[in-house]
């Protein structure tokens, strides 16, 4: 029944790993096959967006019961590339889910720039899809 001051997580981003990685094929000897963590339907990394967000909230809601009052929950995430008809702002979707947890308040974000990554214009010269060099560090505090 120990309580914690901080919960820190970098969850899988829904079914992102299950998608073909055409832009990464040169790094992987022309292998663009999906690289799922597991085959389990219970794995967050195998879930469609809405199911992923709901299950992530349920997991973090359960974890929040072990968080001390005034304790912090920090979630690292990266947005998906925009698709036709979808903005794919995962960080905003995660914020909207976590604030549904009783007592959890959104306190802001920090941007982490991954300096180990190189900027690469995927799709050039036919289209321009910039890879992302940053992640969002979302900060929440248990107030109630």
Description of each model-found segment:
Residues 1-144:
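Class I S-adenosyl-L-methionine-dependent methyltransferase catalytic core
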């Amino acid at each position: 029944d120990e309580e914690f001051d901080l919960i820190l997580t970098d969850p899988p981003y829904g079914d992102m790993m299950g998608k073909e990685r055409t832009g990464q094929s040169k790094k992987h000897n022309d292998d663009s096959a999906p690289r799922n963590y597991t085959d389990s339907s219970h794995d967050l990394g195998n879930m469609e967006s809405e199911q992923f967000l709901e299950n992530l909230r349920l997991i973090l809601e359960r974890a929040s019961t072990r968080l001390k009052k005034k304790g912090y929950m920090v979630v690292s995430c990266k947005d998906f590339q925009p698709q036709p008809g979808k903005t794919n702002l995962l960080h905003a979707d995660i914020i909207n889910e976590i604030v549904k947890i009783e007592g959890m308040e959104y306190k802001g974000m920090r941007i982490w720039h991954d300096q180990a990554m190189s900027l690469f214009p995927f799709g050039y010269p036919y289209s321009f899809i910039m890879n992302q060099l940053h992640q969002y560090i979302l900060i929440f505090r248990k107030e109630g």
